[in-house]
Design a protein with these regions (language model features):
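Conserved ABC ATPase signature
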Residues: 105-109, 113
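Helix-to-loop junction immediately C-terminal to a conserved catalytic motif
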Residues: 25
Length: 239
């Protein structure tokens, strides 16, 4: 996985996607092959080297990550533990959309709100590799765009994001590279646009609908743009 990239992993339930994340995080040991982080076998890392500065994992249900009585206390504890100034903590709360529920108990949050709060806490650890298991679960379309902006910002600052997701549209629009996991192995991998444009099953609805008319159109915005452009060309030819 290239450093600084947003790497998405898709595949059917039970294919091994979440297991892969647990192996990268060092939570489980592979029975074949090996996991290397920056060229070094994960087993050679001391726990203090691995967590949280090298790897951080956001699970599907992050409720077990919370120990404080409010989101604010949770973020303040994370900021203090990792030497993050108060103003940076407030900025992280703002960009992750947590400010509206800072005083609430994490257990009282919706699934999407919990995801945001957990992501805010993990961002402050400044990991080199951020692992996300179904990060868009419970999120509305508007916040998915905000999440993508956050992840892209992390990548531009040198972090590597590896996300497992069933959200094909999200992966197609925002990931740099995408891999398909089947029966515990990577069956395909490539640049996101090429991956989804050349796939029959794991592709976007926009690509399925438009592939007879537009080659390599993957997202809704691309299809709309190409339709408008085609209409303009047709109208121009009639004139």
């Amino acid at each position: 996985v290239p450093k600084g990239s947003f790497f998405a992993v898709v595949g059917a339930n039970g294919a091994g996607k979440s297991t892969m994340l647990s192996l990268i995080a060092g939570l489980n040991t592979p029975y074949r092959g090996s996991v290397r982080l920056f060229g070094k076998k994960i087993g050679k890392y001391k726990e203090s080297e691995l967590y949280p500065k090298t790897v951080a994992l956001l699970p599907q249900n992050p409720i077990s990550l919370f120990t404080a009585n409010s989101v604010r206390e949770e973020l303040e504890a994370a900021a203090k533990a990792h030497g993050v100034p108060a103003e940076d903590m407030e900025k992280t709360a703002r960009i992750t959309g947590c400010r509206e529920f800072l005083e609430r108990h994490p257990y009282d949050l919706s699934g999407g709100e919990r995801q945001r709060a957990a992501l805010a806490a993990l961002i402050m650890t400044k990991p080199k590799i951020l692992l996300l298991d179904e990060p868009t679960k419970g999120l509305d379309a508007a916040y998915k765009k905000e999440l993508a902006d956050i992840l892209k910002s992390l990548c531009s600052n040198g972090a590597t994001v590896i996300a497992v997701s069933h959200d094909i549209e999200f992966c197609a629009e925002y990931a740099d590279i995408c891999a398909l996991v089947f029966a515990g192995s990577a069956a395909a991998c490539g640049e996101a646009r090429e991956f989804f444009a050349g796939n029959s099953f794991y592709t976007t609805a926009a690509n399925r609908i438009s592939r007879r008319f537009f080659k390599n159109a993957v997202t809704n915005d691309e299809v709309v743009y190409l339709c408008r452009k085609q209409k303009e060309n047709t109208d121009g030819a009639r004139q």
